[in-house]
């Protein structure tokens, strides 16, 4: 085989190797993004239930204008699903509660997808932690 043919084979192997590495990186980034979106979507649903609790009269099992007394059991019977696990993060105040979703995908060696959602009576704001 001539030198030119060997050089073309080596160049082809390098190009294929780079393409595979880029493809793996893109797949991982997409999986993280999809998990983050799914966790955020679940948190929006839980935030809506928290706001329902806030508005519901105490006689019907609600907070009657306060988040005080809200537990995760009042939001959902399942604290986890295929997207991740969910919890009330920190103390529940009368006018706000923070929900946390921890996803299944690892962002780096030590951290997984994590999203916090601060819920008030009229809004819910998501913050990406990882």
Predicted feature residues:
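General structural signal for alpha-helix termini and helix-helix connectors
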Residues: 29, 33, 56-59
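Periplasmic/extracellular, small/polar-rich flexible segments of pilin-like filament-forming proteins
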Residues: 55-130
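General secondary-structure propensity
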Residues: 2-12, 84-91
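C-terminal juxtamembrane segment of a hydrophobic transmembrane alpha-helix
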Residues: 4-10, 14-32
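Membrane-proximal amphipathic alpha-helices
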Residues: 32-43
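N-terminal alpha-helical signal peptides/signal-anchor transmembrane segments
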Residues: 42-58
């Amino acid at each position: 085989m001539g030198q030119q043919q060997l050089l073309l084979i080596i160049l082809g192997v390098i190009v294929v190797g780079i393409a595979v590495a880029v493809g793996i990186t893109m797949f991982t980034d997409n999986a993280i993004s999809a998990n983050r979106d799914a966790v955020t979507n679940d948190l929006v649903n839980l935030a809506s239930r928290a706001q329902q609790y806030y508005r519901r009269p105490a006689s019907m099992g609600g907070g009657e204008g306060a988040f005080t007394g809200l537990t995760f059991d009042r939001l959902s019977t399942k604290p986890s699903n295929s997207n991740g696990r969910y919890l009330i993060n920190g103390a529940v105040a009368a006018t706000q509660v923070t929900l946390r979703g921890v996803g299944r995908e690892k962002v780096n060696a030590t951290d997984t997808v994590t999203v916090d959602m601060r819920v008030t009576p009229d809004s819910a704001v998501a913050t990406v932690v990882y």
